[in-house]
């Protein structure tokens, strides 16, 4: 960056830029925001704008790019979306009145985690996350600057931190400590996060309660410091810090939520095809955000769940009132975001009109809720604050046709302010007054062509031609002399002109001041507005769940304390919605007190994964308070759901399918309790057959003997079905098929007992593989079934199948391979029953190196 012969203006730019080295600096110059040096070069590429230079003829011209100030937001949005920060430097004085260089200051730093003014507003939350570490536990705080939501918790390990960041869908993470290289790689490379750093703790007793752990206080304080440092203003909309515990909600990792398509479809990354899509009949942006939060964090408190259920039931029983409620909610704007715009000093007349329109709807909503005549609904009604005085202020002050900007005028209603009304009257009637003066003076003077004209130099004046100069009255005074005429003024005309000019100037200034005063008054109501927003959002979500329950014929689930699962004719709610009720085949699911594991066998495409997901979605919907897709449901309360459904390599982190399988299995068996739900689909398929089968068996036994969680384990390893004779809490189920005249029909129904065939070749036939290939596969299958003998399920840790059995059962297609005595000894020494899956994986890896 060459600095020779730098002008005062460019020196000012460089002085500001050095304080914001990690941000694009938008430097206001007149009607443009300019970027210089490296910022200009990079921005020109990213924003596809022209790159020019300042001082083109100089030895070292300065690269320059710019965007118009009125459209700058769309360019800022692009940079933020790409993960960059933007510092905005404004002119702090009128350039016409400036002495020397115009004073400029950065007024805001916009980052991916602090977006408020996007040109494409999104109803979803945008959380900024802060993490600190005290050497033992992690403090994690998060905030949505656009709504003021502010929460904190503490977590035991980095895996939990990573999962919570993913669940929050954060784009920026603020760190108060040094990460390891591996942790930094995870956050930056794998999760594509912008990392920012903050060391100073901001103390605000009005927001942060002291009854927190030290690491929670530092995480929350550093987050607050960063927000104040970037936004550079008082933020009255920030809500008091809320402490939460992960254990107070149904725990699910980001991978689990993704595999279950909770908030977006994992294949399309779109809302359509997700549980969120299915349940979203909300009418407000606040309701949409809250619904997503409920799906993300189902409850574990039976009392809280039943409270939600009760209100949904009341709404279900009153169709007309619920319809009126839904229609009224359509008139409710995003109170949380509008409040934040007021707090940021960015609310325009349209924003206040939306707020006023919303408040005008509240009495109707309150009356409808009262008409339900229900004690559980009355709890919501009693907390509704209609803010009638604020609604009256906005209604009487802001013109309903006011523009979106505060510089165009016509903002304030007539009748609200006497001075403003007077100025408007002067501007409105001034032209008439001038016409009256013109007519009066023409008649009095006898100058028939006397007229009043206007220009910027002379203002209003009487135009008198030379031929009529002798008729000019004495009270006229000369303002200008032209070749063929004279320009005159009068005291009366000057007075009217002064009034009109004053009215024009003062009206604009006064209207601006009045609007600012009104906005300041609105700001004093922010806390009450935020409380109202929460209640309306809750009402919106509950009516949405009632609408969905009625539309799809859902039932109210029950809960028990005896670890029994009973689902009669259950459906996968999302699949049913996509397929249609007529095509979907329901399935019942039953776990009695003695059953902890269902081992499910059956061919691909037969419905095993759907059956497992059906159970998970039923649990999630039930524990978020929703009604569910079944004829009858009775469930225990689960504390966590762990899944491994669907196989895919983690390409970004370089982890194979098998490694991902083992890591997720490890998380499940380490963290699950006997109140958890585990769903494993084809675990072990990512490695060689016998490796996979050995691990699958070991994991099943470990869960059975040590964890006790309710588990569905889907497998292609039919040999594992023999475990039911050795594990008392395991039962076999399978997907029923109908075989007739060589054709196989998958019934998509779960039946008791193990499957007798795999039907893999039939699936290949459905997929359209060539007939010759299928015929060859049949021949190979027949040969394998003839050669191999049934595999013995290992019931004692030291009992390991001989290498000849392994060769005969797995490797006959590829030829025998002699095993060394060393490998045989190593295999015999393995204590399978006392190994974790991760240890088993490591041992297998070491054994393979001996080959």
Curated annotation (Swiss-Prot):
GO CC, alphabetical: cytosol
Keywords linked to the UniProt accession: ATP-binding, DNA damage, DNA repair, DNA-binding, Nucleotide-binding
Coiled coil stretches, renumbered: none
Gene Ontology process terms (BP): mismatch repair
UniProt-recorded Gene Ontology molecular function terms: ATP binding; ATP-dependent DNA damage sensor activity; damaged DNA binding; mismatched DNA binding
Domain of life from the UniProt record: Bacteria
Residues bound to ATP: 602-609
Record's function text: This protein is involved in the repair of mismatches in DNA. It is possible that it carries out the mismatch recognition step. This protein has a weak ATPase activity.
Family: Belongs to the DNA mismatch repair MutS family.
NCBIfam families the record matches: mutS1 (TIGR01070), PRK05399.1 (NF003810)
Name listed for the protein in its UniProt record: DNA mismatch repair protein MutS
Provenance organism: Streptococcus pyogenes serotype M3 (strain ATCC BAA-595 / MGAS315)
Encoding gene (name): mutS
């Amino acid at each position: 960056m060459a600095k020779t012969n730098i002008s005062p203006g460019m020196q000012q730019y460089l002085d500001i830029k050095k304080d914001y080295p990690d941000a694009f600096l938008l430097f206001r110059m007149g009607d443009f925001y300019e970027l210089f040096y490296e910022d200009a070069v990079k921005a020109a590429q990213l924003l596809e704008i022209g790159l020019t230079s300042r001082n083109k003829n100089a030895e070292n011209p300065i690269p320059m790019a710019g965007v118009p100030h009125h459209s700058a937001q769309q360019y800022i949005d692009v940079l933020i979306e790409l993960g960059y920060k933007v510092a905005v430097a404004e002119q702090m004085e009128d350039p016409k009145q400036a002495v020397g260089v115009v004073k400029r200051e950065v007024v805001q730093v916009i980052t991916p985690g602090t977006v408020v003014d996007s040109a494409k507003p999104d109803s979803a939350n945008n959380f900024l996350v802060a993490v600190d570490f005290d050497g033992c536990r992690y403090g994690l705080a998060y905030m949505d600057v656009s709504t003021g939501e502010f929460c904190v918790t503490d977590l035991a390990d980095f895996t939990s931190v990573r999962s919570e960041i993913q669940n929050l869908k954060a784009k920026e993470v603020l760190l108060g400590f040094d990460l390891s290289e591996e942790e930094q790689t995870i956050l930056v490379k794998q999760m594509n996060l912008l990392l920012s750093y903050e060391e100073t703790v901001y103390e605000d007793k009005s927001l942060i309660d002291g009854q927190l752990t030290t690491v929670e206080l530092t995480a929350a304080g550093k987050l607050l410091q960063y927000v104040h440092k970037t936004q550079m203003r008082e933020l009255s909309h920030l809500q008091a810090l809320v402490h939460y515990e992960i254990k107070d909600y149904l725990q699910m990792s980001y991978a689990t939520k993704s595999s279950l398509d909770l908030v977006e479809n994992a294949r399309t990354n779109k809302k359509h095809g997700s549980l969120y899509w299915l349940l979203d009949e909300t009418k407000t942006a606040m309701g949409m955000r809250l619904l997503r939060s409920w799906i993300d964090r189902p409850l574990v408190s039976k009392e809280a769940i039943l409270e939600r259920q009760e209100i949904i039931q009341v709404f279900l029983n009153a169709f007309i009132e619920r319809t009126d409620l839904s229609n009224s909610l359509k008139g409710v704007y995003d109170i949380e975001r509008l409040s934040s715009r007021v707090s940021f000093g960015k609310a325009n007349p349209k924003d206040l009109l939306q707020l006023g329109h919303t408040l005008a709807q509240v009495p109707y909503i309150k009356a409808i809720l009262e008409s339900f005549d229900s004690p559980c609904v009355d709890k919501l009604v009693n907390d509704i604050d209609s803010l009638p005085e604020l609604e009256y202020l906005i209604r009487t002050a802001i013109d309903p046709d006011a523009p979106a900007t505060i510089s165009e005028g016509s903002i304030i209603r007539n009748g609200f302010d006497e001075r403003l009304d007077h100025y408007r009257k002067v501007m409105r009637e001034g032209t008439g007054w001038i016409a009256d003066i013109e007519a009066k003076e023409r008649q009095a003077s006898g100058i028939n062509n006397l007229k009043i004209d206007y220009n910027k130099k002379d203002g209003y004046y009487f135009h008198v031609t030379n031929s009529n100069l002798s008729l000019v009255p004495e009270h006229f005074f000369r303002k200008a002399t032209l070749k063929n005429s004279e320009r005159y003024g009068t005291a009366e005309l000057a007075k009217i002109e002064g009034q009109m000019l004053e009215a024009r100037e003062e009206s604009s200034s006064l209207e601006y001041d009045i609007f600012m005063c009104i906005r300041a008054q609105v700001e004093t109501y922010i806390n009450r507005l935020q409380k109202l927003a929460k209640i309306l959002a809750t009402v919106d979500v509950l009516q949405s769940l009632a609408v969905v329950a009625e539309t799809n014929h859902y039932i109210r689930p029950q809960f028990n304390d005896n670890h029994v699962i009973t689902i009669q004719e259950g459906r996968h709610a999302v699949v049913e919605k996509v397929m249609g009720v007529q095509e979907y085949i329901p399935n019942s699911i039953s776990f009695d007190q003695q059953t902890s594991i269902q081992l499910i066998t059956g061919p691909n495409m037969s419905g095993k994964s759907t059956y497992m997901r059906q159970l998970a979605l039923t649990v999630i919907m039930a524990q978020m308070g929703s009604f569910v897709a079944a004829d009858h449901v009775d469930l225990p309360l689960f504390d966590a759901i762990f899944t491994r459904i669907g196989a895919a390599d983690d390409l970004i982190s370089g982890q194979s399918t098998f490694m991902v399988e083992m890591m997720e299995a490890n998380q499940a068996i380490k963290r699950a309790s006997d109140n958890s739900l585990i769903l494993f689909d084809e675990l072990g398929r990512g490695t060689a057959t016998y490796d996979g089968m050995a691990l699958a068996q070991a994991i099943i036994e470990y869960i059975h003997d040590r964890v006790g969680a309710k588990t569905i384990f889907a497998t292609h390893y039919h040999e594992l079905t023999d475990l039911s004779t050795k594990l008392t809490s395991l039962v076999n189920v399978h997907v029923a098929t109908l075989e007739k005249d060589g054709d196989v029909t998958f019934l998509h129904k779960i039946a008791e007992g193990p499957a007798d065939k795999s039907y893999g070749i039939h699936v290949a036939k459905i997929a359209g593989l060539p007939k010759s290939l299928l015929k060859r596969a049949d021949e190979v299958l027949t040969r394998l079934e003839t050669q191999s003998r049934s595999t013995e399920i290992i019931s004692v840790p030291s009992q390991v199948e001989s290498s000849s059995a392994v060769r005969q059962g797995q490797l006959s297609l590829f030829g025998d391979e002699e095993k060394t005595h060393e490998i045989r000894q190593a295999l015999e020494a393995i204590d399978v029953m006392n190994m974790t899956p991760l240890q088993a994986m490591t041992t297998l890896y070491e054994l393979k190196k001996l080959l």
